[in-house]
């Protein structure tokens, strides 16, 4: 089986380990050969080849960020209460990375950041509930509001921060990290997806040395 055929056969849904899963991509920090989340529970190692249930991080109880989740990654701060494993349907995250100049926009993929191929449980599709939460009084779905404030146990839903976002976030209740991708594999996957969808998917490059 060539690389392109492998992608076609594994890019949507498949049965794995007795579960219905969706294949997705997740960015991690790699420190001393071990994987760690970028933001929430960033000090907790994530093993390869093992199912891990999502957990809700520490919720901020007061102040201007009350109700958000406290992060302990490189940047600190907080994120919205949107529990679950966050992955994407393409290995692209141009909003995360190292700026070329102080306080600039992300321009480079950090040396410690690696893409992985992950499986997200897909036994239950929570999309209808997420869309219901994001529907306004006029019946229009506001995508940035179409989420859940609880972990989608045994399932997943798709989420967009805005309509211009490339691809979707896939938010799931359980995750299995299947393998770490090389930069060449990331480039090949995005190139093939670009040809298939007619959209240019391109992740940030590494900083030139």
Predicted segments with their positions:
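Short low-polarity hydrophobic stretches
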Residues: 3, 87-88, 182
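Short acidic, low-complexity intrinsically disordered linear motifs used
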Residues: 1-8
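Extended catalytic/binding region for NAD+/ADP-ribose chemistry, centered on the ART fold
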Residues: 74-100
